[in-house]
Amino acid sequence: MLAVNEYFEGQVKSISFAGADKPASVGVMEAGEYEFGTAAPEVMQVISGALTVLLPGQAEWQTFSAGEQFDVIGDAKFQVKVATQTAYLCIYG
């Protein structure tokens, strides 16, 4: 079943679905700065655009462009900067 989610006053929208192996969501972020929390480990894949990310325990920001991905540990917070509309796929667990 699909579930539509909206965060940060509509600046981030996603659709959750049951992926082939694990739960997932696909979404779009408007330009801005955001802080997300994780319950379980996540793999974030950038589909279009770019995400500049400060991962838990890291001191330096890293930029991931379309076709790239990064891992986020579970039970953590991470920060994201977005310069232009960016689409992503997030796989949980």
UniProtKB/Swiss-Prot annotation:
Gene name as annotated: ppnP
Protein origin, superkingdom: Bacteria
Function: Catalyzes the phosphorolysis of diverse nucleosides, yielding D-ribose 1-phosphate and the respective free bases. Can use uridine, adenosine, guanosine, cytidine, thymidine, inosine and xanthosine as substrates. Also catalyzes the reverse reactions.
Coiled coil, from the record: none
Source lineage: Bacteria, Pseudomonadati, Pseudomonadota, Gammaproteobacteria, Alteromonadales
Record's protein name: Pyrimidine/purine nucleoside phosphorylase
Organism annotation: Shewanella pealeana (strain ATCC 700345 / ANG-SQ1)
Family membership noted in the UniProt record: Belongs to the nucleoside phosphorylase PpnP family.
Gene Ontology molecular function terms on file: guanosine phosphorylase activity; purine-nucleoside phosphorylase activity; thymidine phosphorylase activity; uridine phosphorylase activity
Keywords tagged on the record: Glycosyltransferase, Transferase
Classification via CDD domains: cupin_PpnP-like
GO cellular component: cytosol
